Amino acid sequence: MAEGFFFLPKTAQYQSGAATHTVAAMLVPLNSVNAITFFGSQVVQAICGFGHFADFVAITAQRIVMHPAKSFRWRLLAPQLFAVGVLSIPVVAITGAFIGMILALEGFNQFAALGQEDRLGGIINMSVVKQIGPVLAAVMVAGRVGCALAAELGTMRVTEQLDAMRAMAADPMQQLVVPRVLACTIMTPILTMYSNMLGSLGAWMVTVKVFGVSGPDYWYWTAQFVSWREPFGGLFKSVFFGAAIGLVSCYKGFNCRPGAAGVGQAATASFVASFMAIVILNLVLAQFLNTLIRWMYPILPSVLG
């Protein structure tokens, strides 16, 4: 069997030696034994990493449940609420408005071909409040806030500030992680409402002001398509999205590698992991909510006929 080579990323951690030696160390002979060993080690590392993260989540939840007075201490929570929520409003509002405009712009011709352009607003607003708004707001929070949290906590780890807190009998989990996780959990649903509102207004602007659809028809069909179930489902999911962003970002910061490169890698990894958590949770929670609604309302009225 002819041997090739495959890339071994773990050697990229080594920073000593010449660059040519590092590149040579990253090329490992490819055969069945090495391939099985490599992929097996990656699986083991992934399982161990998930176990460490689950332990991190359990400790955070224990701190919140067992020490609610410390967890909701306004002096620690208020700055995080401001950083996560207030400072994220512009980017969430702008992206939400433009998403609504784009959906109206792309969907109008298809609906007009069917003679149903007056119902375009209902379809767009249902999609925005149920799926697009919560996911969009969560992704913006993950990009703007999650990376910053991971970088901040990673810098504290690299500069040994976390060890100093432990030496002074302070709990980094209670003082640093809990306020940030709570802030993300509380503010993400609020930002989702901003995203929903601006998305609906953006779609209205294009549909009514540009394409000339009747304004009363736009809002009438919005009321027909969007019941209490859609906004409730979107806000319900956004709570889990925010908690996932806070937990993942803090975990990546607490476990970053030494050096400036480690902090940058932690920030990048926090966004990637947060985005994956958002889309996975969105699928799971969407199926859960659909099943719950079908159980509560076996026969739902249709507005498509």
Positions of predicted regions on the chain:
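Short, membrane-interfacial amphipathic segments enriched in basic
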Residues: 28-77, 252-257
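Active-site cofactor/substrate anionic-group-binding motifs, chiefly glycine-
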Residues: 71, 80-136
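Start (N-cap) of specific transmembrane helices in multi-pass transporter permeases
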Residues: 80, 160, 171-192, 266, ...
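Hydrophobic alpha-helical transmembrane segments that constitute the membrane-spanning cores
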Residues: 95-98, 138, 142, 178-207, ...
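Membrane-interfacial helix-loop-helix connectors in multipass membrane proteins
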Residues: 106-129, 197-239, 248-269, 289-305
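Hydrophobic alpha-helical transmembrane segments of multi-pass membrane transport proteins
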Residues: 120-163, 191, 248
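Short cytoplasmic-facing helical segments at TM-TM junctions of multi-pass membrane proteins
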Residues: 153-178, 259-263
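Hydrophobic transmembrane alpha-helical segments of multi-pass transport and channel proteins
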Residues: 189-193, 197, 227-243, 271-284
